[in-house]
Amino acid sequence: MSKQSSSGRRAGVAPLAHDRPALTHRVTLDDIARASGLSIATVSRALGGSPRVAAPTREKIEKVAEQLGYRANVAASLLASARPQILGLVCSLQQELHVRYRAEALRYAEDRGFRVIVESIDASRDVDRAWESVLQLRAQAVIAVDSTCISTRFTNTPTVLIGQRAPRRDIDLVTSANELGMGQAIALLVRRGSRRIAFLEGPPGPSARARKAAFTQACRAHGVDALTVAGGDNVDAGFLAIRAGVPAGVDALVCYNDQCAHGAILALLGDGLIPGRDMLVVGCDNSAIASSRALSLTSIDRAPARVASLAVDQAIARALGDDDRPSRRSVDTELVVRASTG
């Protein structure tokens, strides 16, 4: 039988977290190496996912690391890696659709073994600073959600745009085709009796122009009046657009996005009008707002999971150098019908 130490432990086995006083410093690879009786190099390879480490050894090291409360320094690992599997994602998290793209891109990239560094632009953080941040963490390619998230400084970085029109020929583009979903929306409104339909426009840019063009084309195809009203991409914009007044006789609204539609509905309710009865309302993006019981908004779904997966696939191909030819991918949109259209 093996000798026992005075404390009841077997000789030659390093104490683990439950046997020793809690460490007061950040747990390091050296701590794990001493506790497991292995070299620092082996520990580093195991925790870094190297295939050179046998499964039983990896499991032992991971168990020791967990017992010691080890937390990897992710930033240091990313900076030290010879060829890190990292993508950047630049978006505006004030927009519901961008939030959805972010979630889908993170999930899909993780399945492919890549990390995604996310930066959001807003009034206090411009697009160049956002790009600089993801590139400092060695993103090998960047996905931009909307052309407003494209940097004009970092033009040598492989770039994939989720949007309507690429500002440069070397940028990969994944777009949601507006025509099918918008055509379905106008067809539904016409079946429900609408004859004068107003489009609450979005902020200036390729996305707003593409949605407006699809709206006008669909109205023309169905022989109904297509009117436009200044709107925007947030709740206040939709609310103020309705308060400012819509053209006489308008019996249905198609809004640039769901947030704009949300504001329009609040204004209609404030005026004593019932959405789905007194005014039919359609949004775009099929966000969580649209699907909520509180709003139940008919909306055009942009297939964000499919769009994000295509963008991630192309970004990975560019990051690995597998494909240096800019691609153009398109995904159809589809109408999701709810109570706001009767």
Predicted regions span which residues?
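Short beta-strand segments enriched in small/hydrophobic residues
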Residues: 35, 40-44, 79-94, 188, ...
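Short beta-strand elements in bilobed, periplasmic/extracellular small-molecule ligand-binding domains
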Residues: 109-121, 198-199, 216-236
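An alpha-beta-alpha
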Residues: 185-228, 327-341
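Alpha-helical recognition/docking segments in bacterial nutrient-uptake
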Residues: 1-3, 24, 85-187
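N-terminal helix-turn-helix DNA-binding module of bacterial transcription factors
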Residues: 1-82
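Periplasmic-binding protein-like
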Residues: 88, 134, 138-146, 198-201, ...
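Flexible loop/turn connectors
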Residues: 5-6, 22, 247-254, 259-342
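Hydrophobic alpha-helical segments within soluble ligand-binding/sensing domains
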Residues: 172-199, 209, 235-243, 261, ...
